[in-house]
Regions:
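A surface/extracellular/periplasmic glyco- and lipid-processing/surface-interacting theme
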Residues: 1-20, 25-255
């Protein structure tokens, strides 16, 4: 899902079970909302092209990956792993909302918003794609996406010797309570999460081109502010793929 400033606000993000934000080319970020059940997606977008840093996260789960267009690296990954029809490259027959108005009052119909900020898809389109292409969506998973401690056992995990402990001195204690989290993806793209004790959730905000922080909202859900019970920040190396400097395609080191 597009997250360049001009594309905001997005649709459908509040229904995601997991929302990933990762830096891509040019210092911008994009979102990948992950849904357990595609029937609950509603409308989602603006849909943009696929990148391998997102694809590699969902690859072990054999999830349906929907996007519009893809980088050459992403395309090669899909070929190498024989992802077939699970890699959808047209937004599940995505459609244009030429009249959508962004946060700054700009629209494609008014000649002030680029075309790439206007594509959306929805649960019906996804269902039609799955049905018409006979895509196998049956999965049996033996674990969750992240390996959390089972809260029902009342135990904690000793992280003192974990790989994350290397970040303790620089970024603060790994397991401390977080009232405020700010992530600087690049000089222009920053995200922060503010903890609300009354709800036990974090409210998401993003920095805009005018220097102001604004709530991240889902305009398909009456501008509902995105909130999360858990925020996970993954520290890793991100750099340009050798040979892809012209388009600044980013490689994310996951292992």
């Amino acid at each position: 899902v597009n997250n360049i400033v001009a594309a905001r606000p997005q649709r459908g993000l509040s229904k995601a079970d997991i929302l990933f934000e990762i830096k891509v080319e040019g210092g911008i970020t994009r979102f990948m909302p992950v849904f357990t059940d595609y029937k609950t997606v509603g409308e989602v977008g603006p849909v943009r092209s696929g990148r391998d840093q997102f694809f590699r996260l969902i690859l072990p789960w054999q999830a349906l990956y929907i996007h519009e267009g893809q980088s050459v690296v992403m395309q090669q990954y899909a070929i190498d792993y024989d992802y077939g029809k699970l890699n959808n490259n047209d937004g599940a027959n995505g459609y244009r909302d030429y009249g959508r108005v962004n946060w700054a009052g700009k629209s494609y119909n008014a000649g002030s918003l680029a075309l790439e900020h206007t594509m959306y898809t929805n649960a019906d389109n996804i269902a039609n794609y799955i049905s018409s292409q006979n895509v196998d969506m049956n999965r049996t998973y033996n674990s969750t996406f992240f390996n959390f401690v089972d809260y029902r056992l009342g135990t904690t995990r000793d992280l003192s010797n974990s790989l994350d402990s290397a970040y303790s001195d620089k970024y603060g204690p790994v397991v401390s309570d977080g009232q405020y989290i700010e992530i600087e993806h690049s000089q222009s793209y920053k995200t922060r999460f503010i903890y609300d004790e009354s709800t036990n959730e974090y409210k998401m905000q993003q920095n805009y081109s005018d220097g102001q922080w604004r709530d991240t909202v889902d305009e398909a859900a009456d501008n509902k502010v995105l909130t999360f019970p858990n925020v996970i920040v993954l520290y890793t190396d991100i750099h340009t793929y050798p040979g892809h400097e012209a388009k600044d395609l980013q490689y994310v080191e996951y292992a």
